[in-house]
Amino acid sequence: RRYRPDWLEDRPFTVMDSADINAAVKACKDELRLGKGDRSFPRTQAIVGFLSKARNKEMRLDEVLQREAFHLLPYAEPLMRLGEAYDAYRKEKGLLDYDDLLFELEHLLRTNERAAGNLRRRYTHILVDEYQDTNLVQARIVRLLAGPEGEGLPPGNVMAVGDEAQSIYAFRGANVRNILDFPKLFPGARIIRLEENYRSTRPILDVANNLLEHATESFRKKLFTRREGGAPVRLVTPLSDMSQARLVVRRIEDLLTRHLPHEIAVLFRAGFHSYHLEMALNQAGIAFRKYGGLRYTEAAHVKDVMAYARLLLNPLDMPAFSRVAELHEGIG
């Protein structure tokens, strides 16, 4: 907040969360009367994803649709108008979304040498974790914070931790070239290979090493572990989510003949992926506990309280106002 964007002038501003962003895009969509009576028009959450993806990949929205949602190309023009309306909405209401924070910081570091110098003096060492999942603007911010060679941070004061073989967020705009090109951007960078794996057994690492050998471009490494034994890796390709769930249930039933329930776990990439398995377990009469889900700040009652505080800070925060209004009868 110390280095607020110039276009805000002296107005208060609010940083939006995901629910606010959805509400703002929906308000703009309703204002433009888009999708009325058209069941094929993309839903608000999907639109938010495409708008953010276009910014993070630094592409035009129609280019993103061409590559990733060809069936939505007929809606490219109205969706681009909606994107422009959303941009105007945020500026009018004094709102910044997550993507704004990145691009406004980059703009500050490029155009305000005094602010850039202050930040470099304040943050004398930079450590970026999961560097393989950074996008283009995040990598540029790291470079700008480091400063020009000979004038910015001393060599060795920038450290990136990551694994180019684990770049899984390209769909959000992550660019694996950021970590592959790190030694070129920071000449003299020292590469420290962390090859001992403390989590996995040898059969798992044998498969991983075999896959790594086929990479066309990477930092060569040979993973090893002191954990001997372990079951061999099995690759199973179910025909559907439900057949996968039934397969897992049968495996759990078999394991329960030899193990206690608390010794059995199923790992998921995301909480909602467990939906079919939860149904299958209930049908089989197998009790289970699910760990994970909504974060505390995303719970409805917490967001209600936060809406009051945000509205006091910024009376133009319409997503917060709408949430508060819904809590009181006779408003709206």
Model-derived features: where do they sit?
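Conserved P-loop NTPase-based nucleic-acid remodeling module centered on helicase motor cores
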Residues: 1-49, 55, 70, 236
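Short alpha-helix plus adjacent loop in nuclease-associated cores
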Residues: 1-2, 165-170, 199-200, 290-313
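Alpha-helical scaffold elements adjacent to nucleotide-binding pockets in ATP/GTP-utilizing enzyme cores
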Residues: 2, 20, 24-28, 141-144, ...
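Conserved helicase NTPase motor core
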Residues: 16-21, 51, 71-181, 194-200
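Amphipathic alpha-helical transducer elements in NTP-driven molecular machines
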Residues: 18-22, 44, 76, 80, ...
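Proline-centered turn/helix-capping motifs that create local helix->coil transitions or kinks
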Residues: 55-63, 149-151, 211-221
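Conserved helicase C-terminal RecA-like lobe
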Residues: 68, 72, 155-158, 260, ...
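Helicase P-loop NTPase motor core
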Residues: 187-190, 195-287, 310-314
